[in-house]
Amino acid sequence: MEYDEKLVRFRQAHLNPFNKHLGPRHHEQEPNEKAQEVTSEDTLPELPAGEPEFCYSERMMDLGLSEDHFSRPVGLFLASDVQQLRQAIEECKQVILELPEQSEKQKDAVVRLIHLRLKLQELKDPNEEEPNIRVLLEHRFYKEKSKSVKQTCDKCNTIIWGLIQTWYTCTGCYYRCHSKCLNLISRPCVSSKVSHQAEYELNICPETGLDSQDYRCAECRAPISLRGVPSEARQCDYTGQYYCSHCHWNDLAVIPARVVHNWDFEPRKVSRCSMRYLALMVSRPVLRLREINPLLFNYVEELVEIRKLRQDILLMKPYFITCKEAMEARLLLQLQDRQHFVENDEMYSIQDLLEVHMGRLSCSLTEIHTIFAKHIKLDCERCQAKGFVCELCKEGDVLFPFDSHTSVCNDCSAVFHRDCYYDNSTTCPKCARLTLRKQSLFQEPGLDVDA
């Protein structure tokens, strides 16, 4: 009996850790072993009290098989006391002073300084079990109070039951997660990227291959492959990179590169990070279509119409700025959702192009154009007095630079009938008059000296 106990203890201590089917109390029988077989009905002798039991996970740790070799996400600060945070804040201040002014590195250092100060503020308030504000990887999480709305955790991809679980939402990128998942987050807040680098990837699906990613998810670095592993590789059509199923939920989004190059608005599958970035960027006017794809105006008639309406609105803007009635009526606020329309005629957002494609932007902009023109030409006497009379034919109604049948001199901004201007292709009358006036001003002092 003593021999059996020693044999059991020996096999428990030398269990093969790679055999997943055998527990700590089961063993394989050697082929040349003459000992009696232990059936499933037989019970193994109990170990004496006080003897340490070997378990599978402990043996795995001893062999180094359960180690986490992945580095922690960039920006994750693990300081546990106030003194370490204060020291890190002072070092960050020194780095900011040493970096060049207005450089990208200095901006990133300022963001990190804000993050450290907010983290310090959290540690100074230890009384709250679940703080209302949590700052992590540039996310600014607020505790949600809604108990009835059912959401999905962006980290563990499971349902958030607000009635029994505490959860947070980032105010910048609307990232949602359980309170227990906060410290496991590896994705930085994309709102900081939007504020610092407001630009799109304009190459269509710039794929580099799984080998360039070391066969790991581009975000969380989990092992992925096209086949052979539990986590399938899913490609993001915006970045061209591959992600695991936790970071890529097969969300659909319109790809900016396909819009500006192919006028293609079909939604494609993108990762969660790309989806949130595109959602935050959708209304930002960062696309200069004339430089990216000037031929697009030759094939999309609606873009030509929109460009003409925007040019007219820019010509109307000086009338409104100098008109008291227009300022009181706040006419320019009709375009408050598209402030770039009263600043230039070149920049577009993806939201603008989407509405051009659906035919909505042309209708709404034409309506606003009509309201603006009505104020200048009919409703306001001050604005009417700023009109022009064609100096070539001296006939017809008062002209304005945004009228469709007029032409504007590039030098003096005088307005003429289009037919009159092109039929009399000589010098502009107003330009000639201004030239004579300048010559007379230069000659008068000379005449006084001779006299």
Curated annotation (Swiss-Prot):
Q: Which InterPro entries match?
A: C1-like_sf, DEF8, DEF8_C1, PE/DAG-bd, RH_dom
* Superkingdom of the source species: Eukaryota
What is any one GO biological process for this UniProt entry?
A: positive regulation of bone resorption
What keywords are annotated for this sequence in UniProt? Metal-binding, Phosphoprotein, Repeat, Zinc, Zinc-finger
Q: Where in this protein does the record put region Disordered? A: 18-48
Residue ranges of the Phorbol-ester/DAG-type zinc fingers?
Answer: 138-189, 368-428
Name a GO molecular-function annotation: zinc ion binding
Which Gene3D superfamilies does the record associate with it?
3.30.60.20
Under SUPFAM superfamilies, the record lists: Cysteine-rich domain (SSF57889)
- What is the annotated role of this protein in its UniProt record? Positively regulates lysosome peripheral distribution and ruffled border formation in osteoclasts. Involved in bone resorption.
Subunit structure, interactors included: Interacts (via C-terminus) with PLEKHM1; this interaction is weak but increased in a RAB7A-dependent manner.
Give the record's family classification: Belongs to the DEF8 family.
Q: What is this protein called?
A: Differentially expressed in FDCP 8 homolog
Q: What is the source species?
A: Rattus norvegicus (Rat)
Task: Please state the gene responsible for encoding this protein.
Answer: Def8
